[in-house]
């Protein structure tokens, strides 16, 4: 199990609030937000921070919880965003632009992230050199260019051998509509591409290992639970799914992995540059 946090970022200018989640400490996550606001703000919240000055913002812990994966944490985060996150963008809809929870749910669209875009190598080295006087570790280097909210590899980050393909994950993969429609389209995709994943029935004792499934079952009637099947994919199969994914988010996820590979190569160049200038 991992320790996760739901947090809020407030400011002393107005009542607007940003809700987020992290598997790091909230202090580390806040440092990332501030760095993104200073560097190259792209999302609504980081532009807001940059416009008004990061010195006007503070972070507070809302909830500490044990989870098996980052996606279980995101499922909880989403409920907090709907109720409190006036500076969040929910599935393509800026919550500050709507007024009631019902409006948010009605206007809810497919969850979509932009493709990660890296600056040229010389600019990458310049940014990394300015970021710290000491030599950055590779994870610190990557964090400068890919924020936690854009790390698609968290999809595979689980303490269990399998990953519950929940509505949230299907949203992340780019499947639209209600859960039943999402699951139907996803199963067709699996069959078409000869990818076989597990289906757990309610009698499977392993269900109790998945908090996200247990949470779903709380809101189901007994007869619905008895007939329900839960999809479980191991990390290797999920990677195969990503490679063949033809939804709106497919290219963005694959582009992320290309950028990760480029950053590993860029880090080697940064290391050579740092060592050359500090010896």
From Swiss-Prot:
Family matches, as InterPro entries: GIY-YIG_endonuc (IPR000305), GIY-YIG_endonuc_sf (IPR035901), MSV199_dom (IPR018879)
One Pfam family, short name: MSV199
Protein name according to UniProt: Uncharacterized protein 019R
Organism listed in the record: Invertebrate iridescent virus 6 (IIV-6)
Domain GIY-YIG: 2-90
Sequence similarity: Belongs to the IIV-6 019R family.
Gene3D superfamilies xrefs: GIY-YIG endonuclease
């Amino acid at each position: 199990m991992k320790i996760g946090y739901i947090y809020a970022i407030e400011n002393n200018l107005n009542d607007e609030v940003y809700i987020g989640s992290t598997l790091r400490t909230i202090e580390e996550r806040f440092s990332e937000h501030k760095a993104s606001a200073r560097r190259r703000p792209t999302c609504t919240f980081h532009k807001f921070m940059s416009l008004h000055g990061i010195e006007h913002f503070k972070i507070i812990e809302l909830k500490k919880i044990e989870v098996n994966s980052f996606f279980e944490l995101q499922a909880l985060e989403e409920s907090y965003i709907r109720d409190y996150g006036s500076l969040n963008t929910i599935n393509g809809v800026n919550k500050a632009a709507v007024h009631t929870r019902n409006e948010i749910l009605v206007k809810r669209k497919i969850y979509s992230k932009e493709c990660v875009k890296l600056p040229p190598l010389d600019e990458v080295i310049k940014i990394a050199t300015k970021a710290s006087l000491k030599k950055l570790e590779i994870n610190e280097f990557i964090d400068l260019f890919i924020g936690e909210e854009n790390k698609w590899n968290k999809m595979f980050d689980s303490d269990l051998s399998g990953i519950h393909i929940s509505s949230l994950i299907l949203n992340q993969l780019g499947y639209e509509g209600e859960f039943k429609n999402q699951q139907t389209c996803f199963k067709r995709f699996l069959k078409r591409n000869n990818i076989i994943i597990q289906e757990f029935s309610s009698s499977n004792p392993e269900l109790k290992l998945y908090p996200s499934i247990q949470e779903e079952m709380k809101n189901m009637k007994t007869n619905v639970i008895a007939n329900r099947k839960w999809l479980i994919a191991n990390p290797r199969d999920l990677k195969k799914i990503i490679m063949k994914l033809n939804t709106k988010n497919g290219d963005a996820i694959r582009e992320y992995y290309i950028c990760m590979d480029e950053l590993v190569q860029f880090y080697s160049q940064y290391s050579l540059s740092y060592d050359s200038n500090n010896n």
